[in-house]
């Protein structure tokens, strides 16, 4: 009975804190401790060293002052017992303490207040989170590096591309080396071009730099500067779109010239259409007339008198060969072939009119010798027309052989007189 009494009185020796908690959970206090024998003192003796060891470990790992080990001891529960490092603290108390001390786990190793499972999760999650953040950071750095490399390559490509500048209002005596010398101080120049016409420089040109950055710097420095009293302007040259469109003729005969204008320039060709259908104005602009033997002959609406003695078959064949050619240069061979044969004068017309389609206007201009020296008889008119045809060189009259060329001022300011002044080497539009 004495031993039984000692066994019943043994549990209150666990400590003051454990006695209070044991009164709330009497069934838990009377449960046998695993690993203990039939003797009563062994459960209390087995619980005391483990609690003290856990308190010692907590004091070593914790830098802050903690409570006494007896106050931290928790009684055992009926659930399966936790592993030994937890020292009897149930898992239901571990979760709130883990939340309270989650931010201090990296600084303090409080193994007493938290279970190993939350710490394991935190330790396993934190490296993965750190690795994920590092991976994201590295990926972002790689992306930023790629973008910066792309931007730098684009900038280098844009700077390395050649650029063309338009320079206007430059002095008229400037030539390509002068322009190259003026712009060469800013960078390498690929090409320099000054635009000229038949009277000299037009006062503007183009400079092509190898590097667009050099071109921009030259444009900023030289734009608005005064060179030899002229304020030059430097701007970016705009690309001119060169369209190679085929010229569509609006006329039925295939010529690039209006029939009215063509009849003025070469009346013989259009008069020959009554004999050759190839150079007719077409059915739209001609009146069909039934000729002898049922042959339809197209008479043009522009009715011109036929010139006797004119070689119509030859002229018509030549004109048909050159149909569609531009009259700006190449088409003159048509009229040159027509004028090769000295035409006969038309008695019904005044003597000043002769069959030279291009240069008939010169006679109205200012040459009194032609106006009064032309006799009214047909024989003299024929000789004068032949002389006038031989006098022409096919493009412009050689005015240097004219006896009235040296007169100053000219007799009158007709077309031929003013043209002779320009062809004689004098031009009031010459820059210097």
From Swiss-Prot:
Domain of life: Eukaryota
One example of a Gene Ontology biological process annotation: mRNA alternative polyadenylation
RRM domain: residues covered: 163-239
GO molecular function, one term: transcription corepressor activity
Region annotation Disordered: where it falls in the sequence: 1-169
Keywords in alphabetical order: Cytoplasm, Methylation, mRNA processing, mRNA splicing, Nucleus, RNA-binding
List of residues that carry Omega-N-methylarginine: 323, 423, 428
Biased composition (Polar residues): 60-69, 101-121
Site, as annotated: Interaction with RNA: 164, 172-173, 197, 202, 206, 230, 240
Modified residues (Asymmetric dimethylarginine): 339, 371, 423, 428
SUPFAM superfamilies (alphabetical): RNA-binding domain, RBD
Biased composition (Low complexity): 1-21, 122-159
Gene3D superfamilies tied to this protein: 3.30.70.330
Compartment(s) where it occurs, according to its Swiss-Prot or TrEMBL record: Nucleus; Cytoplasm
Keyword Metal-binding: no
InterPro entries to which the protein is assigned, alphabetical: Fox-1_C_dom, FOX1_RRM, Nucleotide-bd_a/b_plait_sf, RBD_domain_sf, RBFOX1-3, RBFOX1-like, RRM_dom
Quaternary structure note: Interacts with ER-alpha N-terminal activation domain. Interacts with RBPMS; the interaction allows cooperative assembly of stable cell-specific alternative splicing regulatory complexes.
Function field: RNA-binding protein that regulates alternative splicing events by binding to 5'-UGCAUGU-3' elements. Prevents binding of U2AF2 to the 3'-splice site. Regulates alternative splicing of tissue-specific exons and of differentially spliced exons during erythropoiesis. Seems to act as a coregulatory factor of ER-alpha. Together with RNA binding proteins RBPMS and MBNL1/2, activates vascular smooth muscle cells alternative splicing events.
PANTHER family named in the record: ATAXIN 2-BINDING PROTEIN 1-RELATED (PTHR15597), RNA BINDING PROTEIN FOX-1 HOMOLOG 2 (PTHR15597:SF31)
Name of the featured protein: RNA binding protein fox-1 homolog 2
